[in-house]
Amino acid sequence: MIMPQTRLVVADNTGAKEIMCFRILGKKRVAQVGDIIVASVKEAVPRSNIKKGDVVYAVVIRTKRTIKRKDGSCVRFDDNAAVIIDKEGNPKGTRVFGPVARELRDKNFMKIISLATEVI
């Protein structure tokens, strides 16, 4: 469950390390895996394309909140993580670190799925 003011780890190589959500796109109060959020960069690597204070779009790829699946299984991750995307929904980075939830496939984020090392 990602709400406004929630800080997320950035799981790609764009140069941002941490972002803070301040808007969830769509008519939702909380964001789950696969939802698009608008966030502000709170921590960034020096000399990268994305600077601290930049406003970015991101898609949530991992949450600490348990994800219940239709087959009865439950999945939970150790951190809240997101991947920075552009307005068309393509990831800005070329690598995705850590596992990614399978729910992204249902939301048609195939590019992120293909960049991920592990899909759970």
UniProtKB/Swiss-Prot annotation:
Q: Report the InterPro entries cross-referenced here.
A: Ribosomal_uL14 (IPR000218), Ribosomal_uL14_bac-type (IPR005745), Ribosomal_uL14_CS (IPR019972), Ribosomal_uL14_sf (IPR036853)
A Gene Ontology molecular function term for this protein is: large ribosomal subunit rRNA binding
Q: Which Pfam families match?
A: Ribosomal_L14
Gene Ontology process terms (BP): translation
Going by the UniProt record, its keywords in alphabetical order are: Ribonucleoprotein, Ribosomal protein, RNA-binding, rRNA-binding
Any one cellular-component term (Gene Ontology) = cytosolic large ribosomal subunit
Family, according to the entry, reads as follows: Belongs to the universal ribosomal protein uL14 family.
This chain's function reads:
Binds to 23S rRNA. Forms part of two intersubunit bridges in the 70S ribosome.
Q: How does it assemble?
A: Part of the 50S ribosomal subunit. Forms a cluster with proteins L3 and L19. In the 70S ribosome, L14 and L19 interact and together make contacts with the 16S rRNA in bridges B5 and B8.
What PANTHER family does its record include? 50S/60S RIBOSOMAL PROTEIN L14/L23, LARGE RIBOSOMAL SUBUNIT PROTEIN UL14M
Q: Which NCBIfam families match?
A: rplN_bact (TIGR01067)
| Protein name as catalogued | Large ribosomal subunit protein uL14
- Organism from which the protein derives: Dictyoglomus thermophilum (strain ATCC 35947 / DSM 3960 / H-6-12)
Query: Upper lineage ranks?
Result: Bacteria, Pseudomonadati, Dictyoglomota, Dictyoglomia, Dictyoglomales
